[in-house]
């Protein structure tokens, strides 16, 4: 919230409401009207007196209408309606004088200047990276700290410290806040684009999704830089100035300004950390969706047709086209520790901090030794029966990971003749909690 807005809200709210009601203030600016207002602002800035005639407004309306082709032709009637609408909403002031022979001249009102100035200035300022904006703030704060450490009269503090903090540092903080809100909109836009791509054709969309996710990573790095710079250097500078004014009653106005800046800084850093968490969570969600949820061949229909086509190749030849896409980046943690809820009983000290990967390697070795017996004896491996017997002696929370490792070790030993005959196996239960597996008996090694 800007300093002016903070001063305004301290006034009685009913007084402001009565004022708005008395003068019948209202705003209705569709996209085309807003574009017309911005075009008028640009033309006004090019004029020394910032005054425009009706002809110039009609020309501006024609330019806008040409870019909004679906809205209709740029007739004089529609242009006059648009001008009158802006005048009615107190965005344009109309003047008529004898010097202009009855023709009207127009100027932007303070309200219109505030609206257009926001869009024009914000468009230019939002192009700056947050790291650059924070560097600008740090430079201004350094000037204020230097002046504060020099000390001096109250006039010195008002000119060289208070002025810099209130009208320079505070302004940049407000712009950073606006830029952060734009980044929130960009985050939502990226989510919508990814959802739209995946809903249309996920095969062709994976590369596009990866490009969008790379933008996410760039944003993450920028947010982390923002937190580091804002949380360290700026905080130190604020504390340095507070130390200089501590206990001096004549400099209470400096302390009030520092308190307002501290609130803005806290808001920036808090927003940054929250956004980082949201970006990471969404990035992992999309990668998980691409890895697991996009399974368009759950019934193995495609694999069966492919095997059948290979068997019939000499009778019905065909061409194979394949795409070698780059692998998606996996942003999961490199190592995961054992979950507390999975640890039961007394845990020995030597394995208390053992990582999950080490446990997986040990279990995989044991499972491999168990399955080698089937290979040595030439016996078939019915994965459904093997899994059911093996999982029965382990806690339920371990079933998913253990089943994955059993299947992984089994397919390394051999394969099923039924797979090459395109025979689809039935789903078979492997525990008493609803878990099922669909796999042919491994009978070739």
Swiss-Prot record:
GO terms for biological process: cell division; chromosome condensation; chromosome segregation; DNA replication. This is Chromosome partition protein MukF. Involved in chromosome condensation, segregation and cell cycle progression. May participate in facilitating chromosome segregation by condensation DNA from both sides of a centrally located replisome during cell division. Not required for mini-F plasmid partitioning. Probably acts via its interaction with MukB and MukE. Overexpression results in anucleate cells. It has a calcium binding activity. Belongs to the MukF family. It is found in: Cytoplasm, Nucleoid. Residues 213-241 are annotated as: Leucine-zipper. Interacts, and probably forms a ternary complex, with MukE and MukB via its C-terminal region. The complex formation is stimulated by calcium or magnesium. It is required for an interaction between MukE and MukB. CDD domains: MukF_C, MukF_N. NCBIfam families: PRK05260.1. It holds the Pfam family KicB. GO terms for cellular component: cytoplasm; nucleoid. It comes from Vibrio cholerae serotype O1 (strain ATCC 39541 / Classical Ogawa 395 / O395). Keywords: Calcium, Cell cycle, Cell division, Chromosome partition, Cytoplasm, DNA condensation. One of its GO terms (molecular function) is calcium ion binding. SUPFAM superfamilies: MukF C-terminal domain-like (SSF140570), Winged helix' DNA-binding domain (SSF46785). It comes from the Bacteria.
């Amino acid at each position: 919230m800007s300093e002016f807005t903070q001063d305004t809200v301290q006034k009685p709210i009913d007084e402001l409401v009565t004022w708005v009601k008395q003068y019948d203030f209202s705003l209705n600016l569709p996209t085309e009207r807003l574009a017309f207002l911005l075009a008028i602002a640009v033309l006004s800035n090019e004029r020394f007196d910032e005054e425009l005639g009706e002809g110039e407004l009609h020309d501006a309306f024609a330019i806008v209408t040409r870019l909004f082709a679906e809205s209709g032709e740029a007739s004089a009637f529609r242009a006059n309606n648009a001008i009158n609408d802006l005048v009615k909403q107190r965005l344009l002031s109309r003047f008529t004088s004898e010097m202009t022979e009855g023709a009207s001249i127009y100027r932007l009102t303070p309200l219109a200047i505030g609206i257009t100035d926001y869009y024009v200035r914000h468009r230019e300022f939002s192009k700056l990276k947050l790291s650059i904006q924070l560097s600008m703030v740090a430079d201004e704060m350094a000037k204020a700290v230097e002046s504060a450490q020099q000390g001096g009269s109250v006039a010195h503090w008002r000119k060289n410290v208070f002025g810099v903090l209130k009208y320079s540092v505070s302004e940049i903080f407000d712009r950073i806040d606006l830029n952060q809100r734009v980044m929130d909109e960009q985050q939502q836009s990226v989510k919508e684009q990814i959802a739209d791509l995946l809903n249309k054709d996920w095969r062709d969309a994976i590369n596009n999704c990866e490009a969008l996710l790379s933008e996410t990573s760039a944003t993450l790095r920028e947010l982390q830089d923002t937190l580091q710079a804002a949380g360290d250097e700026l905080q130190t500078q604020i504390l340095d100035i507070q130390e200089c004014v501590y206990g001096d009653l004549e400099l209470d106005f400096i302390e009030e300004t520092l308190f307002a800046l501290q609130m803005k800084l806290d808001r920036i850093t808090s927003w940054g950390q929250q956004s980082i968490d949201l970006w990471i969570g969404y990035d992992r969600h999309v990668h998980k969706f691409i890895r697991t949820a996009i399974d368009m061949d759950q019934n193995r229909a495609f694999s069966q047709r492919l095997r059948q086509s290979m068997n019939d190749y000499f009778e019905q030849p065909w061409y194979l086209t394949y795409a070698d896409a780059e692998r998606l980046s996996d942003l999961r943690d490199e190592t995961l520790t054992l979950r507390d809820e999975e640890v039961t009983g007394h845990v020995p000290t030597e394995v208390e901090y053992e990582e999950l990967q080490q446990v997986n390697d040990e279990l995989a070795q044991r499972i491999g030794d168990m399955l080698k017996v089937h290979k040595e004896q030439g016996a078939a491996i019915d994965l459904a029966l093997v899994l059911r017997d093996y999982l029965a002696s382990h806690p339920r929370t371990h079933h998913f990971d253990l089943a994955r490792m059993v299947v992984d070790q089994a397919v390394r030993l051999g394969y099923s003749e039924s797979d090459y005959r395109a025979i689809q196996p039935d789903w078979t239960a492997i525990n008493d909690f609803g878990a099922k597996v669909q796999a042919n008996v491994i009978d070739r090694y």
